[in-house]
Structure formats: structure tokens, C-alpha cells
A protein has these predicted regions:
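Short glycine-rich anion-binding loops that position phosphate/pyrophosphate groups of nucleotides
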Residues: 1, 22-24, 57-59, 174-175, ...
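Switch II (G3) loop of P-loop NTPases
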Residues: 4, 168-174
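Short amphipathic alpha-helix with an adjacent loop that forms part of the alpha/beta core around
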Residues: 9, 255-263
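Short SAM/SAH-binding signature in class I
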Residues: 15, 128, 262-271, 277
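Nucleotide and nucleotide-moiety/phosphate-recognizing core
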Residues: 163, 200, 237, 252-255, ...
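Short acidic-hydrophobic, aromatic-tinged amphipathic segments that line or gate anion-handling sites
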Residues: 245-257
Length: 293
């Protein structure tokens, strides 16, 4: 607590955006509300005349509005009354659903968006970016053009092709319960077999054991047939997952096991906190020079 507030005088932002309150850094903040209040320090420190960009769909939207010191708010999401939203359905296509199309609605008009990112949470992130762009005067067509030029951040739901032609969804950059759920939502939409390579989720404090048990349950609910886990905490996930779950003490052994089983009808999600260095697993499974198909 207080870290965001301490930085605000240095930056003096005219736009403040919090994408969501996620189950991360619970070890330091104690609860989800603690996380949300720490993130809300951004809104509390905005100057008069600045714009607060608020996720209207988030559980803590009302808290952030109460904390907002700016004179202007631009909301985004699917909630009724949101300033920046979507009309109609989201249509996914491309390898592992890596292209999403939708109609963007802003106070200035509408535009068709072709977003080259997987995951419904990335549509929500795109709405946040659109709301910020609207706040600085960019029209709907300009926003749509910018969103269409986006590319995945390395290790954030990057779709690649592994040995044997399997799809690999590289989400190895970091992990917490919220981002794992988002990754599993993407995996659940894939055809064929769905596998999960899971590393520890760090900085969860007293919630760590239950969070990893819930990870095993969530994987099963997402239709995952095989769970390959590594890390001190992921044994809880394997125990909860049951049949098809395997725990490894060594990354090389995990890679050898996964590589020996992969086939073209498999999609595998790779997810874990930075401490696991799961990018090494990705590098071992993806042939050099191959990123997608």
C-alpha cells in the first residue's frame, strides 16, 4: 500500500486507467479489497481536470469511483451505461482463437474491430484502451485501426506450434488465479485434447494452498485431460485434478514427458509465475523459427 500514491507526484498523469482488480500480490495486501484499494490510489491521486478510466464490470468499480479525485470519468465494459462498450457478439477465429472481431461503441460512434489477441479478457483490455483513447479525442475509427495493429506481448497468450503440430499457448510470463482463469477460458474453447503445464503461482500468502487446489479444479472444469505440474505448490493442484495429473521435480523431465506425448490434436497452455521460468519449457517444445501455423 502507498507505492502508487508515492509515484503519482513524479508522473502527474492526466489519464488514469486500472484494467481490473486481480488476485495477485495477496501476500502484500491481504485481501482482494486491499489490492483494489492499492490500485485505486491512482484514481485518488489524479489532478482536477484529469480523466479516470473505470472498468464498469469490475467488482470494485464503485470503490474506485468513490476514490476518484478527477473531474471526468470514462467507463468501459459490458455493464449497462458504460461509455465504451460492445454491440453484439464477439467472433473468434484464427489459430487457437487468436483473432477476435466485434463492434466497438463509443460516445462518438461505432467501428468494426479486428483484434489480433486471444482471450475475452483481452477484449476487455481493448475496451479500456479504447476508453483512454476516447478521453484524449481519438474517434471510433481511429481506435479500431490502432487496436488492429496490436500484437501479443511475449509470454502472454502467444499462439505457437510445438513439435508434432500441436498448438501451444504460451502464457508463461507470469501467473495468478485471475490470469490462470483467463488462460483456461481460452483453452476451454479449443478443439481436441486440452493440456495444461502449470508452475507455481507466487505471492499469494495464506491463500496459496487453496489457490493451487482451486487451479486443479478449474483445469478439470475447463476440459483439461492432462495436467503437467512443476513447483513446490503445484502438488496441491495435481491432487485436486486427479487422474491425468502429474507432478515433476525437474523441468527437463517435464519437457521430455510432454514432448513424447504431443500430437496435432492437442492444445497445451503453459502458465506459471516468473520464478518457474517456464519460457524454457516453451523454447524446448517449439522448433526454432516456428511461431504459428
Amino acid at each position: 500500500p502507498g507505492e502508487v500514491a508515492a509515484l503519482l507526484p513524479l508522473v502527474q498523469p492526466t489519464i488514469g486507467l486500472v484494467t481490473n482488480a486481480g488476485a495477485e500480490h495477496l501476500e502484500g495486501f491481504g485481501s482482494m479489497e486491499g489490492v483494489a484499494r492499492a490500485e485505486g490510489e491512482l484514481f485518488a491521486g489524479l489532478a482536477h481536470g484529469a480523466s479516470a478510466i473505470v472498468n464498469a464490470d469490475d467488482t470494485y468499480a464503485a470503490l474506485w469511483r468513490d476514490m476518484n479525485a478527477a473531474t471526468r470519468e470514462v467507463s468501459f465494459g459490458r455493464a449497462a451505461g458504460a461509455d465504451v462498450t460492445i454491440r453484439g457478439d464477439i467472433r473468434a477465429s484464427g489459430p487457437a482463437g487468436s483473432i477476435q472481431e466485434f463492434t466497438l461503441v463509443t460516445p462518438d460512434g461505432e467501428a468494426h474491430v479486428r483484434l489480433p489477441l486471444a482471450g475475452r479478457h483481452n477484449v476487455q483490455n481493448a475496451l479500456g484502451a479504447a476508453a483512454a483513447a476516447h478521453a484524449v479525442g481519438i474517434d471510433a475509427q481511429g481506435i479500431a485501426a490502432g487496436l488492429g495493429r496490436m500484437r501479443p506481448v511475449r509470454g502472454r497468450l502467444e499462439v505457437k506450434v510445438a513439435a508434432g503440430g500441436a498448438y501451444l499457448i504460451d502464457d508463461s510470463y507470469n501467473a495468478n488465479p485471475s490470469s490462470l482463469d483467463a488462460g483456461l477460458d481460452v483453452l476451454a474453447e479449443q478443439r481436441g485434447e486440452r493440456w495444461l503445464v502449470l508452475g507455481d503461482m507466487a505471492e499469494l500468502g495464506d491463500a496459496a494452498h487453496e489457490a493451487h487446489r482451486q487451479a486443479g479444479r478449474a483445469a478439470r472444469s475447463a476440459g483439461v485431460s492432462r495436467l503437467f505440474a512443476i513447483g513446490a505448490m503445484t502438488g496441491d493442484a495435481v491432487s485436486e485434478f486427479g487422474a491425468g495429473g502429474e507432478w515433476f521435480a525437474d523441468g527437463d523431465a517435464l519437457v521430455a514427458r510432454v514432448a513424447g506425448l504431443l500430437s496435432e490434436d492437442v492444445t497445451v497452455l503453459i502458465k506459471g509465475s516468473r520464478v518457474n521460468r517456464l519460457e524454457r519449457v516453451v523454447a524446448a517444445l517449439v522448433p526454432a523459427g516456428v511461431e504459428g501455423r
